[in-house]
């Protein structure tokens, strides 16, 4: 157990050697040298990614949770930015971060910690710096670099997606995290066909766990339901993840030199397809395997409950099921797959053509099979997104006409129109 000890002094501490002792043997004595211009303080938060020289704002925050003590308000304290040679290159006083009462999730101030802001946007020279607060200390070193800060962030996010892959072993050749293959039929995992659709679950018509648990235990086994990316903190793989595939496609299509050159150290690295697209294909291929011969898309795989305590993805004891097909899931897949095929075409035309044909089949099935239940307009809202993506990828005027006839450019949220 880690305990944070907050000590309040009547006056700011000078730079000095400090020894902390406790009245009993429960806490061992701690000795350290305190210098507010170099000593680390967890109260000073800087960007782990760093900044570009021309970033409009470069900020750090100062905040610490006092436990059961009184809130610690540091507004007005002096701050400095110090380079590697110890030179002060910027300074100022802490400003309050929030200018109005804090109301988090409608529940007031959940942290009980005041937050102050440091804006050091005037620092533009590349290098490594410390952001320090008088009588408090300094945050972790922050770097200003021309090319590495945002690129590093993009690589970390995409690498995190690789670690969310289902149906693949993680080994030392691609990761410091090693785990067995998870949720793969060759390892004895049995996944059966459910009657409930992911759209019905998404619309809260029924709870997913309860509906799946009611599935016939002898229902049809779906042989090829492996792959995709795990969802959040559990092992679901839902068609929503095609949004990620579509966003990855946008990155590579719009910025081929930058996003297309990112090397993620994944199994596909070096195969001629940008790594960002290769990882997106891991999800697209999963849903293509779930596609029925008539084009319908089944909306993913889910188990009958949240992960069991002390279990892991490769030893998941819960029963797993494939959702039944529905038009909303088919539109979502059609939009993402068409966008991905469009981005993939310059690198692997054959695979792109197969993916685009799959996307068209999904869109055509959704057009011919409107919802048989009240879906609160979800399929209708997704329809123009799929049509726009299919038109962009194929040039087929029928999809253009469908966009024109169905898109609500006045009331529909921009993200719903792609």
Feature locations, PLM:
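Extracellular distal adhesion/interaction modules in secreted or cell-surface proteins
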Residues: 1-10, 100-101
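Surface-exposed, short loops/turns at beta-strand junctions within beta-sandwich domains
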Residues: 8-15, 121-126
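Acidic, Ser/Thr/Gly/Pro-rich low-complexity segments and short DxT(G/T)-type signature motifs
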Residues: 12-43
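Short proline/glycine-enriched turn/loop motifs at strand-loop junctions of beta-rich domains
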Residues: 13, 26, 64-68, 72-75, ...
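Glycan-recognition and catalytic cores of secretory/periplasmic carbohydrate-active enzymes
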Residues: 17, 38-43, 55, 72-113, ...
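Contiguous beta-strand segments within globular domains
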Residues: 41-73
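Short strand-edge motifs at loop-to-beta-strand transitions and within beta-strands
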Residues: 116-118
């Amino acid at each position: 157990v880690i305990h944070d000890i907050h000590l309040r002094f009547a006056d700011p501490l000078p730079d000095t050697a400090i020894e902390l002792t406790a009245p009993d043997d429960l806490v061992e004595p701690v000795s350290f040298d305190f210098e507010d211009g170099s000593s680390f303080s967890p109260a000073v938060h800087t960007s782990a990614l760093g900044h570009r020289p021309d970033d409009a704002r470069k900020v750090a925050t100062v905040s610490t949770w006092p436990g059961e003590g009184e809130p610690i308000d540091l507004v007005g304290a002096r701050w400095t930015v110090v380079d590697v040679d110890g030179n002060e290159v910027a300074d100022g006083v802490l400003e309050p971060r929030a200018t109005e009462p804090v109301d988090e999730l409608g529940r007031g101030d959940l942290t009980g910690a005041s937050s102050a802001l440091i804006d050091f946007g005037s620092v533009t020279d590349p290098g490594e710096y410390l952001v320090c607060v008088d009588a408090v200390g300094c945050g972790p070193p922050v770097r200003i670099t021309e090319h590495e800060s945002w690129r590093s962030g993009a690589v970390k996010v995409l690498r995190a997606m690789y670690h969310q892959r289902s149906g693949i072993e993680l080994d030392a050749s691609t990761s410091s995290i090693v785990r067995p293959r998870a949720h793969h039929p060759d390892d004895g995992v049995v996944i059966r066909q459910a009657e409930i659709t992911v759209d019905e679950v998404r619309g809260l018509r029924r709870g997913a766990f309860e509906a799946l648990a009611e599935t016939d235990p002898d229902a049809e086994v779906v042989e090829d339901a492996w792959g995709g990316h795990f969802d959040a903190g559990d092992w679901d793989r839902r068609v929503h993840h095609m949004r990620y595939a579509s966003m990855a496609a946008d990155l590579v299509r719009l910025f081929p030199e930058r996003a297309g050159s990112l090397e993620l150290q994944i199994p596909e690295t070096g195969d001629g397809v940008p790594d960002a697209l290769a990882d997106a294909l891991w999800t697209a291929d999963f849903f293509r395997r779930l596609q029925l011969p008539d084009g319908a898309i089944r909306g993913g795989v889910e188990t009958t409950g949240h992960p069991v305590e002390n279990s892991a993805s490769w030893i998941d004891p819960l029963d797993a099921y494939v959702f039944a097909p529905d038009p909303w899931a088919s539109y979502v897949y059609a939009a993402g797959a068409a966008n991905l095929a469009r981005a993939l075409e310059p690198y692997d035309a054959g695979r792109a053509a197969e993916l685009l044909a799959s996307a068209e089949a999904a869109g055509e099935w959704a057009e011919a099979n409107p919802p048989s239940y009240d879906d609160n307009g979800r399929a209708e809202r997704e329809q123009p997104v799929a049509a726009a993506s299919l038109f962009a990828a194929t040039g087929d005027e029928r999809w253009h006409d469908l966009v024109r006839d169905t898109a609500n450019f006045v009331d529909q949220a921009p993200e719903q129109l792609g």
